[in-house]
Curated annotation (Swiss-Prot):
Function (record text): Binds directly to 16S ribosomal RNA.
Entry keyword set: Ribonucleoprotein, Ribosomal protein, RNA-binding, rRNA-binding
Protein name: Small ribosomal subunit protein bS20
Family listed: Belongs to the bacterial ribosomal protein bS20 family.
Amino acid sequence: MANHKSAQKRIRQTKTRTERNRYYKTRIKNIVRDLREAVLNKDVAKAQEALKIANKELHKYVSKGILKKNTAARKVSRLNASVKKIAQSA
């Protein structure tokens, strides 16, 4: 255990931030999973709605500093491509 008051505070802050980041990362994974399920089932309407939500959430987490800009851009690009592919084939 830390002896300095500032070190104890840092430990508390790290714990809080870790929990918060874990919540956001889990939320991102769930949103992406829902979108991929809709794509696999070839449900265009549901996929487009899920894409809208995913796009909004990913960009929000970039502004909060949870994700890096290029990571979110890569995820959005790949998700867009998968939805576009099923929309064209339908």
